[in-house]
């Protein structure tokens, strides 16, 4: 018996059996469909594989990035360092594209933008340095989020922020330090912006937590922060020259007197506020005359300090 089905094909109706008499699909059509399916599967697999390979390569690059930073910190040729750092920063940001939640990379980026802006941009182009500090801050705040400080830190009430900071442990110290450092410099370069000045208390709160958790982190950098903080303003505006001197002394003790930026900042901020020309001159002269590689692991910082000290000494008669 024959009958038409809904598709128009003729079928033979047989008890317990169904046999199609429609023309079979060409082998080429079947092959094309199979190839299409296989190609789709392969493309999906390749996409997933490319993603995982990219992340794997990024993770394997972390030790290389760290080694590169160590080598850069040992550099004493300022022109070479100035020309090389931007490429390193873009490399780090490229790795962040693959690993956006990697706190280590975010901290490296924040540190890099801070160092480049402070060492090579700020003295001649404050507006550009401000943008670089802001980029560093964004990376550091992302690292803080990964470390457990969620939410918009800039929008938090100060008391609420302090409560959240109290819950953080030593693992958050690097992110706290670089966030506070970049934030404070960004504020310093935008003093005419009331919104920026209003955030200073939050940057200070972040660095205060660093002091509480590990005051030796990054060569006692938190003490340098507060040495400048207390020394860069008159007492009527919250300055405290004794506290400032004590903070610089603590930073000097942590580094064995080999980190020249300690004397640089004490002369630049505290000695100028105290109108102490002799201290200003003597400290900066000592910075210039001390070999940059007295502290090999921080030779670049020392070379930058020497360069800045020479510029400050050139203005001594103008200020005193």
Regions found by a protein language model. Give the residues of each.
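Short coil/linker segments at helix-helix boundaries
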Residues: 63-94, 98-101, 112-212, 221-255, ...
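Charged, well-structured binding/catalytic surfaces in domain cores that contact anionic ligands
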Residues: 217-218
């Amino acid at each position: 018996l024959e009958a038409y089905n809904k598709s128009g094909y003729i079928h033979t109706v047989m008890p317990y059996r169904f046999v199609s008499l429609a023309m079979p699909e060409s082998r080429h059509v079947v092959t094309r469909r199979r190839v299409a399916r296989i190609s789709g599967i392969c493309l999906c697999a390749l996409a997933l594989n490319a993603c995982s390979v990219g992340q794997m390569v990024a993770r394997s690059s972390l030790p290389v990035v760290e080694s590169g930073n160590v080598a850069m910190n040992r550099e004493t040729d300022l022109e070479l360092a100035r020309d090389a750092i931007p490429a390193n920063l873009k490399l780090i940001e490229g790795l962040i594209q693959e690993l956006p939640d990697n706190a280590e990379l975010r901290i490296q980026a924040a540190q890099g933008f801070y160092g480049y802006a402070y060492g090579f941009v700020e003295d001649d182009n404050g507006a550009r340095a401000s943008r670089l500090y802001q980029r560093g801050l964004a990376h550091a705040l992302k690292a803080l989020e990964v470390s457990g400080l969620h939410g918009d830190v800039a929008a938090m009430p100060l008391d609420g922020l302090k409560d959240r900071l109290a819950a953080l442990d030593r693992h958050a110290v690097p992110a706290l330090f670089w966030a506070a450092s970049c934030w404070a410099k960004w504020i310093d370069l935008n003093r005419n912006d009331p919104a920026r000045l209003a955030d200073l208390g939050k940057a200070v709160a972040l660095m205060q937590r660093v002091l509480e958790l590990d005051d030796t982190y990054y060569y006692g950098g938190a003490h340098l922060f507060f040495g400048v903080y207390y020394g860069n303003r008159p007492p009527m505006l919250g300055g405290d020259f004794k506290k400032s001197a004590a903070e610089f002394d603590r930073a000097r003790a942590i580094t064995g007197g080999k980190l020249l930026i300690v004397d640089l900042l004490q002369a630049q901020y505290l000695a100028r506020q105290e109108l102490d020309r002799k201290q200003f001159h003597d400290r900066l002269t000592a910075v210039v005359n001390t070999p940059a590689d007295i502290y090999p692991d921080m030779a670049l910082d020392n070379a930058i300090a020497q360069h800045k000290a020479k510029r400050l000494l050139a203005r001594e008669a103008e200020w005193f």
